[in-house]
Amino acid sequence: RIRGQAVRCDYTVSMQYGKTGCFQFPGSSLSGKIFIPDISIPFHADCLKNPDHENHLGTWLSTPEFIKKLLPRRPLESHKGDFGHLFTVCGSSGMAGAAMLASMGALKNGTGLVTSCVPSKLRDAIPGQVPEIMTLSPPECLEMFEEKDSDFVIDRSHKGSATVLGCGLGIHSRTTEFVRTLCREITSPLL
């Protein structure tokens, strides 16, 4: 919470280290572009390296550059199949975006292969937007998943390293039974 008054900035300069309030809402909405100049405080200063020090910062800013250093580089000879295969069971009539966003998020986060199991009315919408996503549909599943689709989905889920279930499925009672069955029967890690 911002106490008192605050100025909406185009630029903020935060000496040596970013201040938490500049990166979290609501302060982030007022900070503008943030610059953090080095003013020669050594990183090994006691207040930084010792969590028991009374002035220890206790927080770290995760920037894309910081995260990139933590992630292993993929070998040049690797194949997309080396990085997992996610099976998503998502979507219903009017909810193609939920299935697409779940699958796109998996690809963006490094999953090698993604297969999206959706009702047949949604099946052509996804590859048209994101050709990397493979799609399939249970026979006779037009607009929403039902209990009769569970065997088809369970059989195909075993091809994936993990399964995502739920994005945009809706709340129809027939879909609820389908979800209960999948939660009991799918043996791969289920999200």
Predicted regions located by residue number:
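Rossmann-fold NAD(P)-binding glycine/threonine-rich loop
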Residues: 1-10
